């Protein structure tokens, strides 16, 4: 992750990332939050924003952020990594498309989807997927172009391939099926 440098070793990632972002652009506002995300905190935090970018490395956090984003009718740009592969989707309750839990109804069994810390990630991949997420966010903010709402873009850095698949809303989804 190029945002973290040797000078930041020993510093919590949230603060080293904050310092690097401000060093690149001192005209931005960064709000670093160093705390575990609980349902109460997520509800309060997500309420402050119009658009959610979710790039956590665990299913529990992804499910929680998705649940709150759907409840608050906020679009969520989701990015995930695994070794050489990255995935990106836009889940937008206002467009009545699927939510994250429609696509991943339950957490994979232990060992089937190792974390980034366990399996490792091709070093440039977080930057590639993060940049794609930023592009999706800008399209949503500017209301321009075609977003990945209802689709998943899968980038395979090992083979240099990109593919896109359509995603379907589940009528039995415990998170979004009750939305009209």
Where are the regions that the model predicts?
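Adenine nucleotide-associated cytosolic modules
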Residues: 1-180
């Amino acid at each position: 992750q190029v945002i973290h440098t040797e000078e930041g070793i020993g510093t919590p990632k949230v603060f080293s990332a904050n310092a690097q972002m401000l060093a690149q652009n001192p005209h931005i506002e960064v709000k670093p939050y160093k705390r575990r995300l609980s349902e109460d905190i997520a509800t309060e935090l997500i309420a402050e924003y119009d658009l959610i970018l979710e790039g956590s490395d665990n299913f529990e956090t992804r499910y929680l952020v998705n649940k709150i984003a759907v409840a608050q009718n906020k679009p969520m740009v989701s990015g995930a990594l695994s070794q050489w592969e990255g995935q990106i989707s836009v889940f937008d309750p206002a467009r009545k498309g699927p939510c994250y839990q429609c696509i991943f109804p339950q957490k994979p069994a232990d060992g089937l989807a190792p974390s980034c810390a366990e399996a490792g990630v091709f070093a440039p991949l977080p930057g590639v997927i993060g940049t794609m997420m930023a592009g999706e966010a800008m399209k949503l903010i500017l209301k321009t172009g075609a977003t990945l709402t209802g689709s998943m873009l899968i980038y395979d850095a090992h083979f240099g391939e990109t593919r896109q698949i359509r995603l379907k809303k589940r009528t039995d989804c415990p998170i979004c099926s009750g939305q009209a």
